[in-house]
């Protein structure tokens, strides 16, 4: 170090230039003693009795003075070069130590303060949690006291204590119901007591998850693709034929395969088309067939034609929807039937199957309406249906036997007796090629697997539906093969919707104690399952919206 800087440093230290340090008159022990003696010779001023705070401050000041004295003594023993180097590297040691002590004291105080605040906060939370939660808002109508008539309800009569309680307010009725519940349960159960359970770590985690759920407004759970069993969510829509009311029996109800249109026909000789919107269902047009009470009407597979038959005629009417022409087919070459009533259209639109008398089934070309071939069973035909791929025909006889035919060869592939059936009435095949349902006169519906019907001579049904007590005259699978509709025209309200594959009946249809369906004659589902329609003997085509299916 240069001599000038060294001498300047020593001079500044001794002159008291360093802040926060008392000036020293010189080096060595003699000046220090002189300084102390000079302090003793100063006259003492009269002071009041020291308080606890002033005593603590005086003790700290004395401690600081002793540290300074020891530090100065040590610094005097160090070489000047070492003292200068420490000052350059560490700064003023005295200031740094004082600042460090001050920071330590302040941090300790903040730590105690924060702990105290946290304890106060926890106590406040405990007190707040014990308080009863108040409602977010209060409805003025709820505050008005409403009187409940106790005598008009048999359940409320049981909780009346005397005749004077024929009318009670809502609050008193609520208290009375609570008392009855507690009496039946033997006290208040744990789940009914607010705050009775202590929160565990799992409860805290679930609460955190709930908080996370409340941070978003999107959908967390997507709609299930499969239809749940038990309750079928549905809405009663305006009748399909509301704009053309009639009192004649409805014989056929069918949805158009490609357009949002429903067809309604009946014994009043009319075929009507309606636009399906679920609200007004406006009429598109009506076709009147003179002296032709319609037994059955059906769309072609492509939806371009409507076929209709009557109860006492061998004429088959074909209505061309594109051209707007009505074409009667008076005679089919090779067909010797006196009447043409029951018929089926193949799903691929290639064939037309007509059920005749004496057990004959006649297969016609849908395009030319010419006879291709005939098939015969033992006994009379009760009902027939095509498989979903149009390669097989299922014929159900009145004797309870089921015949499986190959369409191309028109040969019988298999034949079996419907289990427990003495007289067959209806048959239907599912759209996915999995099930065959047979409805008998006893009201039993047997559901079979189609593979077992082809391979076994005595197949066992998957499930026997026994919810009806009269003959099952109508069967219909929905497009997704999740619902099987069964109905009987022999009894009012005799309709059930069966869930598949559980084979359980939906409990909410039909609505209990509401005679709105009457005697159901025909049923159908819309192409994608969004609507369900049925016609009754009173001339009403009732329609329901199935909420599980978003499309028509």
UniProtKB/Swiss-Prot annotation:
Compartments, as annotated in UniProt: Nucleus, Nucleolus
Cross-linked residues, Glycyl lysine isopeptide (Lys-Gly) (interchain with G-Cter in SUMO2): 78, 178, 197, 513
Keywords, sorted A to Z: Isopeptide bond, Nucleus, Phosphoprotein, Repeat, rRNA processing, Ubl conjugation, WD repeat
UniProt biased composition (Basic and acidic residues): 72-81
Gene Ontology BP, a term: rRNA processing
Ranges annotated as biased composition (Acidic residues): 203-212
Ranges of Low complexity composition bias in the record: 43-58
Start and end residues of each stretch annotated as Disordered: 1-81, 104-143, 183-214
Sequence positions bearing Phosphothreonine: 200, 217
Chain positions found as Phosphoserine: 114-115, 118, 201-202, 206
Positions of WD repeats: 245-284, 289-329, 376-415, 417-458, 467-508, 515-551
Keyword GTP-binding: no
InterPro entries the UniProt entry points to: Utp18 (IPR045161), WD40/YVTN_repeat-like_dom_sf (IPR015943), WD40_repeat_dom_sf (IPR036322), WD40_rpt (IPR001680)
Domain of life: Eukaryota
Cellular component annotations (GO), alphabetically ordered: nuclear membrane; nucleolus; nucleoplasm; small-subunit processome
Function: Part of the small subunit (SSU) processome, first precursor of the small eukaryotic ribosomal subunit. During the assembly of the SSU processome in the nucleolus, many ribosome biogenesis factors, an RNA chaperone and ribosomal proteins associate with the nascent pre-rRNA and work in concert to generate RNA folding, modifications, rearrangements and cleavage as well as targeted degradation of pre-ribosomal RNA by the RNA exosome. Involved in nucleolar processing of pre-18S ribosomal RNA.
Oligomer status and interactors: Part of the small subunit (SSU) processome, composed of more than 70 proteins and the RNA chaperone small nucleolar RNA (snoRNA) U3.
Family: Belongs to the WD repeat UTP18 family.
Name of protein: U3 small nucleolar RNA-associated protein 18 homolog
Organism: Mus musculus (Mouse)
